[in-house]
Amino acid sequence: MLNPINKTIELGDGRTITIETGKLAKQADGAVTVRMNNTVLLATVCAAKDANPGVDFMPLQVEYKEKYSAFGRFPGGFTKREGKASDYEILTSRLVDRALRPLFPDNYHAEVYVNIILFSADGEDLPDALAGLAASAALAVSDIPFNGPISEVRVARTDGKYIVNPTSAELEKADIDIMVAATIDNIMMVEGEMNEVQESEMLEAIKVAHEAIKVQCKAQLELSEACGKLVKREYCHEVNDDELRKDVHDKCYAKAYAVATSGSGKHERSEAFEKIVEEYKAQFSEEELTDEKLEMIGRYYHDVEKEAMRRAILDEGKRLDGRKTTEIRPIWIETDCLPGPHGSAIFTRGETQSLSTVTLGTKSDEKMIDDVLNHGYERFLLHYNFPPFSTGEAKATRGVGRREIGHGNLAHRALKRMIPDNYPYVVRVISDILESNGSSSMATVCAGTLALRDAGVPMKKPVSGIAMGLISENKGTNYAILSDILGDEDHLGDMDFKVTGTKDGITATQMDIKVDGLSYEILENALAQAKEGRMHILGKILEAQPEAREDLKPHAPRIETMIIGKEFIGAVIGPGGKIIQGIQEKTGATVSIDEVDGVGKIEISGTNKATIDAAVKAIKAIVAVPEIGEVYEGKISSIMPYGAFVEFMPGKDGLLHISEIDWKRLETVEQAGLKEGDTVSVKLVDIDPKTGKFKLSRKVLLPKPEGYEERPPRPERGERGPRQDRGDRGPRQDRGDRGPRREYRD
């Protein structure tokens, strides 16, 4: 018998979120459905009963999946079935993972699988803002050890107003779009994009999010209590030896502290740390060094390294590479470093290096997006690659991983608002990380800015980025904020806070917190210190490349855009695409046309200006309106005894009367040397107001012969007197069958 339990959360604006358990997926360790209007997600959690041997980390796997049926759609492709995860699904999975992972106990190593499935959607309420709540609620109603609950919300600012979990329509107009995850007491994760906002405005958005999250966390606690899941399962995944722990600390700490304050480079420092632990192990015999003991020594020595690094910073202000807490590593930059790409740059900061390239494309290069809720075309792409050799690892290069997609997305969001809305090119930025020792995604932002400017992309403003760190103790009462963190400072520290922006404000951010007790004061100070670092790096970028390249590189495609009336779209395309295909074949240019906002938007691209100009001329001829007094190049389509019909514009014929061919009198058109198919210059001299027929003249374009006398104009009938009697000519003879009268073509 079903006995579902549910809780309702009020958002404060009339909307509600309902969490329910006990109805679906009851064999999972925990399962809930979360509903907001017509958006419904199911979240389940399952954990192994014990940890696998040798595992000393948290093997958490979060999978967010969307069903096309949720929105009443069929999947694409031959199989008509959901396939591998989309970028949106991967990014949503990462948002949930980053919020949950720090809250599992440090000594809990059993495999945990979190599955979140979108079963219903209406396109208005976005499911990624509900996924974190669903996952945490599923853990709350399970017996899996978890120091939650948490929740995630999206906050947008539209017309100066902060909105929690905005609709898709509200989000389109927002200048702030951030996702925030938190417990009742602490912020855990922030990620989002902004339109050059100030640090105080971003901080206010985080505060608004946290207030909403507190309500959602309390609802989860009530749900957990109603389910009777307040007691968590027992586990023992680590064997400990307090005497060994003390011995490792006593014999290794001083040596580790000396290395931590030596200011040595990454590999030298790594070798020195490794030498210390190897020397410690050497005091034991092979029989004594069991696998269990080796695992404990490694774990205890890791704690020693961490303590040494943190104490050196907190007590002496000395960082691993010898820098001060606010100091940025040395930067060197090279632009236009590769001849083939349309733009290129190398950005190196300390031991982190990005080689970024830019490719400019046309409309045909747009990326088609066909997710469940998101479908359309993307014109600005950024791809981030992190090969193993960048950290000196000897292993095979696999496909694109979740981390690469996440880092690339952050850099993409940092730069995309700085590309002009009306920029005609499709742009692809590729960042290949060639060296890495922290802040590689921020190096991507800086290298991407440089490569875009080298390609001649007229960015609104250049963007720089920096990664900030934190070392704190005693609930944040004693702390040090670190600018431009190293990989080890990220790993052993309490915060990874990435901030990107222009001289006028923040464009994107990503923050992960690993400790309790991060105050808003620390966040405010971190943002202020980050701004100083960003401005320093931006100065280096502007020194290397003060302005964007004025013109594209010679081998970059050229694009020209035309706007035509909606009524001309069919004429340009032609029956079955005949006209537009003919233009492309004749000129060598690529032509695409779309109806946008009630007009026809034509994009013409080619490898050189001549091909584009030829295509533009052909299109203008199709859409042009004939004007009296204009001169046209036409083709004689047919010859008659009284003149010639000339196609002077596509689909438009006019009469070139025999008297308008030349200044001298002609008996036949052929006397002027004209024949069908000839090209002739004509001037449009008149348009019949009743019939719309066109009257052309060739002779007005020819020099008037010397001594030529104009024939006097024919007098009006009144001056010529009455018509004379026809006399004895009798009635008009039968004219016979002369056939149909020739019609003018217009």
UniProtKB/Swiss-Prot annotation:
Mg(2+) binds at D490, D496. Pfam families: KH_1 (PF00013), PNPase (PF03726), RNase_PH (PF01138), RNase_PH_C (PF03725), S1 (PF00575). Residues 701-746 are annotated as: Disordered. One of its GO terms (biological process) is mRNA catabolic process. It catalyses: RNA(n+1) + phosphate = RNA(n) + a ribonucleoside 5'-diphosphate. Its EC number is 2.7.7.8. The keyword Flavoprotein does not apply. Its main location: cytoplasm. One of its GO terms (cellular component) is cytosol. Gene3D superfamilies: GHMP Kinase, N-terminal domain, K Homology domain, type 1, Nucleic acid-binding proteins. Keywords: Cytoplasm, Magnesium, Metal-binding, Nucleotidyltransferase, RNA-binding, Transferase. Residues 557-619 form the KH domain. CDD domains: KH-I_PNPase (cd02393), RNase_PH_PNPase_1 (cd11363), RNase_PH_PNPase_2 (cd11364), S1_PNPase (cd04472). Residues 629-699 form the S1 motif domain. It is found in: Cytoplasm. It comes from the Bacteria. It is an enzyme of class 2 (transferase). Belongs to the polyribonucleotide nucleotidyltransferase family. HAMAP family: PNPase. Involved in mRNA degradation. Catalyzes the phosphorolysis of single-stranded polyribonucleotides processively in the 3'- to 5'-direction. This is Polyribonucleotide nucleotidyltransferase. It comes from Parabacteroides distasonis (strain ATCC 8503 / DSM 20701 / CIP 104284 / JCM 5825 / NCTC 11152).
